[in-house]
């Protein structure tokens, strides 16, 4: 009798695991793109002057990538995702020819949103490889300030005028329970950005300038994914 009960429980577990990528189920998760902290100092000298320029500072950055999607057919989920990141830095600079020092601060939050499609290859109870395509439009704006010990200061604000990226990601998800998985992925993305900067000094006349650039990068993610059974499923 005990063997029969155990067999039924094992069969139910396998069926649940195999059903987590079925049509009507939901996919909810979050990935950690990167976390970094840097502490640095530097000295720069030139051949045409005895002055030595010094600087020291630190920076911190973090990015998160939550997502939600619905399985429109077995193993294929369609939905959307966001990428949220924050960068903060602070530095101090001086030189040996002057007693003046300058403190600089920079804050840059970023927010991207867009659609995604993920396809799982198979539905093993242990895990599944997957491929994901995504496209996102970005909204990011930051501010930097510079203050000297002599009393002068300046502020620069950034305003995005067009920022987007798209790409393909390949990964593997390992199921730690029938409905919860840990995943790792690596991809290839391409994007373009256009940003306007507003420079405003405490004295003198300010000005605006615009920069445009394109980028190719390789995103690496690890995170947690939850598979929620569709309505009426147990």
Language-model features: locations:
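Glycine- and aromatic-enriched membrane insertion/assembly motifs of diderm outer-membrane
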Residues: 47-120, 124
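Residues that define the transmembrane beta-barrel architecture of outer-membrane proteins
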Residues: 24, 58-62, 107-113, 127, ...
């Amino acid at each position: 009798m005990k063997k029969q009960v155990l067999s039924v429980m094992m069969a139910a577990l396998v069926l649940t695991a195999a059903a987590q990528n079925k049509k009507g189920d939901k996919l909810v998760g979050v990935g950690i793109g990167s976390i970094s902290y840097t502490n640095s100092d530097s000295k720069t000298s030139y051949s045409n002057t005895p002055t030595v320029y010094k600087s020291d500072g630190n920076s911190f950055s973090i990015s998160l990538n939550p997502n939600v999607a619905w399985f429109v057919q077995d193993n294929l989920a369609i939905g959307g995702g966001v990428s949220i990141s924050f960068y903060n830095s602070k530095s101090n600079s001086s030189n040996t020819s002057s007693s003046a020092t300058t403190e600089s601060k920079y804050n840059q939050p970023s927010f991207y949103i867009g659609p995604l499609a993920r396809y799982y290859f198979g539905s093993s109870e242990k895990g599944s490889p997957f491929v994901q395509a995504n496209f996102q439009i970005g909204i990011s704006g930051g501010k930097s300030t510079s203050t000297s010990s002599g009393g002068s200061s300046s502020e620069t604000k950034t305003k995005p005028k067009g920022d987007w990226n798209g790409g393909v990601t390949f990964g593997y998800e390992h199921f730690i329970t029938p409905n919860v998985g840990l995943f790792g992925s690596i991809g290839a993305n391409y994007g373009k950005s256009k940003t306007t900067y507003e420079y405003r000094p405490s004295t003198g006349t300010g000005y605006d300038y615009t920069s445009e650039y394109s980028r190719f990068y390789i995103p690496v993610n690890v995170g947690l994914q939850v598979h929620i059974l569709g309505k009426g499923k147990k």
